[in-house]
Amino acid sequence: MALPSPASEEAEGPCQEANQEYQEPVCSPVPEPEPEPEPEPEPDPEPVPVPPPEPQPEPEPQPLPDPAPLPELGFEAEPVQEPEPTPTVETRGTARGFQPPEGGFGWIVVFAATWCNGSIFGIHNSVGILYSMLLEEEKEKNRQVEFQAAWVGALAMGMIFFCSPIVSIFTDRLGCRITATTGAAVAFIGLHTSSFTSSLSLRYFTYGILFGCGCSFAFQPSLVILGHYFQRRLGLANGVVSAGSSIFSMSFPFLIKMLGDKIKLAQTFQVLSTFMFVLTLLSLTYRPLLPSSQDTPSKRGAHTLRQRFLVQFRKYFNMRVFRQRTYRIWAFGIAAAALGYFVPYVHLMKYVEDKFKEIKETWVLLVCIGATSGLGRLVSGHISDSIPGLKKIYLQVLSFLLLGLMSMMIPLCRDFGGLIVVCLFLGLCDGFFITIMAPIAFELVGPMQASQAIGYLLGMMALPMIAGPPIAGLLRNCFGDYHVAFYFAGVPPIIGAVILFFVPLMHQRMFKKEQRDSSKDKMLSHDPDPNGELLPGSPTPEEPI
């Protein structure tokens, strides 16, 4: 409104001159034709410049286009909105946009996984028969060979657990098919070469190391690949694999005993190696539907080979799970129990042959262990689902207590029927202990770190599991019988059960302490009022004065 005022003053000047010139001719009518000053009102068009000041206020609204770039700044946020990376992530292995076929070719994969589990653990659970055959060969060279011969089967079983963290890395990097096929081929080579040597030290390497490591690399991918083909029916697929492998492995004690009676140990190794050869072919069916994970995000952030190595090392060897005190105690308790866990599998057959010489069907005991172990795996899964939180550990406590007591009961059995009852409980405890291991790991460290927690746990179990059978064999050499050896085998599981008993109590105590600390933090986390603290009893801060 103030801007047009200078223009109005400029307009008044010419108007006054025009009025003065016009008043003079009013007295004389002659100058009427002098309208020529009227053209001078043409300066009136000069008011036409008056609008130019009006555009001057218009430039002020023109800053309004300047805010218009602000949406452009907001528009630059669209790169965050880029959904292009998400399709690449979904196609690269995350299960978000992936729907398994829930059958079809997946049932062939289930059969391959069943063959894998059944053949591997059928041979390892029948190691007691192989141990007796090995002693018969070595007795001619050395009368006190129980300690040395026990290392063969113990090494093979221990390597399955010892290689677990490494196998998970290879499975993630190379995929299930390559890892499983390579592992089955190594297991075949280990078993087949064991038939060409009679040296105990060489069989430490061929059977204990090669066969054991190959079984570890072939076994874990058989469990991972099921998630590529099943999601809604994954429980059914796992149940078929567990039940099928249990039935499959129950036939191995009878088969190995029959082969041992008709042919020698070397030819028995050759026959068993054919199962690994078939497993090598079946592992080729592990066609991954979810590609193996790649490290492109890591490569973007790591420019040197050393940085990439550190990124991968921290990714695969994450030691944060050991910061959980309850996990450390739980892992230590299970590792302690593993010292006596594998002793009955190795020495039971030889003990029965020495004590019950009239019994020829000693392999029935291993069949009983395999049958109830499969039953325990099926039943314990349903029972653990109904038990909330870390109270599942009490199932492991009970299974370890029974396992220790049953191991101590073996020398006290006076007849073969009592041994059958003991073996039935041994297999049941084995099934309960193994099945609920993963759910407990999820409760302790969460789903993001559960796989690493299980891998570290299996690795910790390897050393005591390897050492247990040789120590029992050494005790047999020292005392002349297996009584002390089986008493020794029962002590570590009982100690492990006592340790595990305190894990839920400690976890609950730590949880309550965290709740108290968090409640204190919430009480102290209110923003202070400008005038000071809250008035006692007032729900709101004191208003500023």
From Swiss-Prot:
Q: How does it assemble?
A: Monomer. Homodimer. Homooligomer.
Q: Where is the composition biased (Acidic residues)?
A: 33-45
Q: What is the lineage of its organism?
A: Eukaryota, Metazoa, Chordata, Craniata, Vertebrata
Q: Which reaction does it catalyse?
A: 3,3',5-triiodo-L-thyronine(out) = 3,3',5-triiodo-L-thyronine(in); 3,3',5'-triiodo-L-thyronine(out) = 3,3',5'-triiodo-L-thyronine(in); L-thyroxine(out) = L-thyroxine(in); 3,3'-diiodo-L-thyronine(out) = 3,3'-diiodo-L-thyronine(in)
The record describes its membrane topology as: Multi-pass membrane protein
| Tissue expression from the record | Expressed in cerebral microvessels.
The record's statement on gene disruption is: Deficient mice display abnormal thyroid hormone metabolism with no apparent neurological phenotype.
Q: Where is this region: 2 X 22 AA approximate tandem repeats?
A: 29-72
Q: Name one GO cellular component term.
A: apical plasma membrane
Region span, Disordered: 1-98, 514-545
UniProt feature, compositional bias: Basic and acidic residues: 514-529
**Modified residue annotations for N-acetylalanine:** A2
Q: Which residues carry this modification: Phosphothreonine?
A: T540
Q: Which residues lie on this side of the membrane: Extracellular?
A: 124-149, 199-206, 257-264, 350-362, 414-415, 475-483
Q: What does this protein do?
A: Specific thyroid hormone transmembrane transporter, that mediates both uptake and efflux of thyroid hormones across the cell membrane independently of pH or a Na(+) gradient. Major substrates are the iodothyronines T3 and T4 and to a lesser extent rT3 and 3,3-diiodothyronine (3,3'-T2). Acts as an important mediator of thyroid hormone transport, especially T3, through the blood-brain barrier.
Please state which protein family the record places this protein in. Answer: Belongs to the major facilitator superfamily. Monocarboxylate porter (TC 2.A.1.13) family.
User: Which Pfam family is an annotated match for this chain, by its short name?
Assistant: MFS_1
Q: Which PROSITE patterns match?
A: MFS
Q: Where are the transmembrane segments?
A: 103-123, 150-170, 178-198, 207-227, 236-256, 265-285, 329-349, 363-383, 393-413, 416-436, 454-474, 484-504
Q: Cytoplasmic face: residue ranges? A: 2-102, 171-177, 228-235, 286-328, 384-392, 437-453, 505-545
Where is this protein primarily located?
Answer: membrane
Q: What is this protein called?
A: Monocarboxylate transporter 8
Q: What Gene Ontology molecular-function terms does this entry list?
A: amino acid transmembrane transporter activity; identical protein binding; thyroid hormone transmembrane transporter activity
* Skewed-composition ranges (Pro residues): 46-70
**What's a BP term from Gene Ontology annotated to this protein?**
thyroid hormone generation
Q: Which CDD domains match?
A: MFS_MCT8_10
